């Protein structure tokens, strides 16, 4: 029996499950169902916008808890992260949320309840948030709760409270992009690998919210390279969900900024095409590497300027995610992991200069600013 179990587990990791059907003759191969990975966006408040983001490829939104919205989301196959009508902290009154919990907690489209946004910035004590979480759960709420932090290091104080921990970081252009990676790394390392962690990346111009950054004048939207870099820095942690802020908020409406909107659509489409990279497991790896030029070997956050992650997807395939977190061209000299496989740059034929890497040797890999390179492991017979 143990041998059969090990065999089935090996087949499962290869992406196939074999089912013996009574009277069906030989074994039938059935594809493994990919687990749900939220690719979401904030600021979706109407059924019209819901249809628009559905067509764009999003499967999750942050939106209202009302019947018309949730029913439309269910029809489109979209999950909704919704406020219960009150936020944890001062004034968290059951009379404000009890009705919504009764009416919508059972709704199939409800993904989770948005417990509170950035309590660390508002300096709401963790004990109070934890107490309000217990109060909320006591009112028959069965769906998970979500909580958003603005600083990943505060996961040490708030991370154990919600069912789903979310971290936002919006550095463009007033902070180095490497801050995004730093906050996600802090949150993941503190919360641990078992904690559901969602990243929230910037898809807006701070000019629309300029009152929140007094004195800042260098307003602009993230470039496509920056948006892609933040996306894959999140996946490299890895995270269990990825959302973007925001579709519509105040005077901001994302489709009014076509370069950013179409760049985001391109990234969302790429995530669907390479869905095997979603929700990977991070493997232990102490890489041997050098980054040139020497004076650029560290980012503005004093971390390595190229982020390196060794991941394994649900089918057992290994990937190296290598990401330049800076605006500078860099060269990475890297010794690849030796694990009975060769490495190939994803999307490149083996006869290119970066195809067909073999383990155990030092390879020099050039990077443009914010460039993402993914090496895929191929088993050697």
Please identify what each model-predicted range represents:
Residues 30-341, 345-380:
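Glycan-processing catalytic domains of CAZymes
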Residues 4-15:
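Bacterial N-terminal signal peptides that target proteins for export
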Residues 15-26:
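Bacterial N-terminal signal peptides
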